[in-house]
Amino acid sequence: MKILMLNALTEQSGSGIRFWSIAKELARQGHSLCFLERSITKNGRMRNVGIRYRSSQDTGIQWLDMLRATWLNLCHGLKFRPQWVFVLKPMPNTCLPALFLKWLFKHKIVLDIDDLDFDYYLDGTRRQLVRFFFQSFPPHFDLITTHNRYLQNFIIDELGISPEKIYFLPQGVETNKFLQAQVDQRYQERWGIKPDDEVIVYSASLGITSDFQHVLPMLKDFVGKREKVKILVIGDGSRKPHFVNKVEAYGLQERILFTGYLNHAEMPMVLKLAKVGINYMAPTRANQSRASIKVREYLAAGLKVVCNPVGDAEAFKDYVTLCTGIEEFPGAIGKALGEKNPEKAREAQKFVERNFSWPHLVEDFLSHLKKS
């Protein structure tokens, strides 16, 4: 089957990781793919067998980038002549080409809604515009996919989409890569990590969706009391310079380390450095609609996990420590660092592999597509 996949964002977005993972699995199962997106770097992603990859350079001038991406997506779509189109996010640079291709070739178009993107903006023109896109584009698609029950209810109640047009496609993980990963000395050397260091990872965007401003004061106090602890902050974004300056002002730049953007293929090896993974999301409507890839990857890597019950975190309640407030995190992290329970870690890995491994999630999705 020939499938055109249109990513509204760039290769460095968390949503893009989900979409690219689906693309790789579709290609692995023998389908012919053309994958298009905006790209922050010149060459975009690492190439993958079976995927024709194209990207348009992201300049930071959003209206221009969106306009150029819309045109390139349409041109490549016309040339590729897909049997169906899979779109990430209800944005014009993906939805307009998909709708035109549907009108021209009469094929099926599918839209993945994985966030309430407009809720991350303050009241104003941009928020209203993105909300308009959310209300306008989804009704024209043959199928809507989503990964969170709260978000699914929003799509039904607020966007007026029939439940029969919605397919629940969980957030998956490339579990085999995390299960097979080994400690890589290069990463230890890169960040000056010693064998007896107690490493904690916090992986998240440091852009407009970030909640790190709530986490940083807690980490400051925590590392001040435990001299062997080092924090790896994995991620990048527009607010990263602000957070780096705060850490330097605290004098903790050798204890709280910012890795910057990492290629997602590096994550299994980087997580092998750590004992504990933490995830905090403020209890907002936007965050309630999320399905954390971080929690899934932490568990797949065998880490102890401390998080709060926002998004779909409670689905992992038997394998993580849930804290209702940020003030509970230090005690929970300290306890997790002292725990030695490899059997529980293996049970968590099996749970993630059984329920959130991309091969069977994509197989089920394809079966549904063939029936619809």
Per-range role (PLM):
Residues 179-193:
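A short helix/loop element that forms part of the nucleotide-sugar donor recognition site in Leloir-type
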Residues 150, 172:
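Carbohydrate-associated surface elements
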Residues 241-268:
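Nucleotide-activated donor-binding/catalytic signature segment of Leloir-type glycosyltransferases, i.e.
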Residues 13, 210, 263-270, 275-299, ...:
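Nucleotide-sugar-dependent
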Residues 22-24, 28, 71-78, 93-96, ...:
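Membrane-proximal helix-turn-helix segments that form the acceptor-binding/catalytic region
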Residues 338-370:
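A charged, aromatic-enriched C-terminal amphipathic alpha-helix characteristic of glycosyltransferases
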Residues 4, 145, 193-210, 215-219, ...:
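Conserved donor-binding/catalytic core segment of Leloir-type glycosyltransferases
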